[in-house]
C-alpha cells in the first residue's frame, strides 16, 4: 500500500512538471491607451531599463482614457522550465509587422523568428543582426516584450483546435 502511494505521488509530480504552469498576467495602465502586462517576476536587466529614457508624456495626455482591451482577457501566460511564454490569439486575416530588420519579408505572420543578434548571411531564416522584440498588428495594437534575453517568436505559425478562428484544414 505504501509503495502504491509513493508511485501515485511520483506520477502526479511528474505530470505537474510536464504541464506548464499558467501564470497570472498583472495588467497596469501606463498611459492612456498604453497597457503593461507582467508575467512572473521581471528581471532587473531589461531593454527599457538599460535605455534609461522616459516617454514624452505630453502626447499621451491628449489621448482619451480607454478601458483594458478585450484582447487582454484572451492572452495566456505560462512559465515552464524557467521559460516564459505568451499566447496572443490572432484574428483570421490579422498580419504582424516588425521584430527588427528583415531584408526579405515585411509580413511576419506564419514565421518562427529567433530574436538575437546574428549574421544575416543572405537568407531569411528568422535571424537578423538587428532584432527588436516589438511588433505591430494589422488589428491596430502593438506589443513590446521588455526582455534582453534571446527570444523565439512563433508569429502565428500554428493553429489551436480550440481557437474561434481555426483555419480550414488542408490535406498536405
Segments predicted by a language model, with ranges:
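Bacterial N-terminal signal peptides
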Residues: 10-17
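Sec/Tat signal peptide C-region and signal peptidase I cleavage site
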Residues: 19-23
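Catalytic and substrate-binding clefts that recognize carbohydrates or anionic sugar/phosphate headgroups
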Residues: 24-172
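Positively charged n-region of N-terminal signal peptides that target proteins for export
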Residues: 1-7
Amino acid at each position: 500500500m505504501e509503495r502504491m502511494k509513493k508511485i501515485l505521488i511520483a506520477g502526479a509530480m511528474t505530470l505537474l512538471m510536464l504541464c506548464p504552469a499558467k501564470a497570472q498576467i498583472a495588467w497596469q495602465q501606463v498611459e492612456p491607451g498604453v497597457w503593461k502586462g507582467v508575467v512572473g517576476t521581471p528581471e532587473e536587466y531589461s531593454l527599457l531599463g538599460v535605455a534609461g529614457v522616459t516617454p514624452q508624456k505630453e502626447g499621451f495626455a491628449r489621448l482619451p482614457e480607454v478601458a483594458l482591451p478585450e484582447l487582454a482577457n484572451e492572452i495566456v501566460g505560462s512559465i515552464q522550465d524557467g521559460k516564459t511564454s505568451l499566447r496572443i490569439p490572432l484574428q483570421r486575416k490579422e498580419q504582424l509587422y516588425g521584430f527588427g530588420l528583415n531584408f526579405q519579408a515585411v509580413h511576419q505572420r506564419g514565421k518562427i523568428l529567433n530574436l538575437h543578434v546574428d549574421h544575416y548571411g543572405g537568407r531569411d531564416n528568422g535571424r537578423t543582426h538587428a532584432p527588436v522584440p516589438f511588433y505591430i498588428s494589422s488589428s491596430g495594437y502593438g506589443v513590446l516584450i521588455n526582455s534582453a534575453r534571446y527570444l523565439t517568436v512563433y508569429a502565428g505559425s500554428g493553429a489551436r483546435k480550440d481557437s474561434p478562428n481555426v483555419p480550414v484544414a488542408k490535406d498536405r
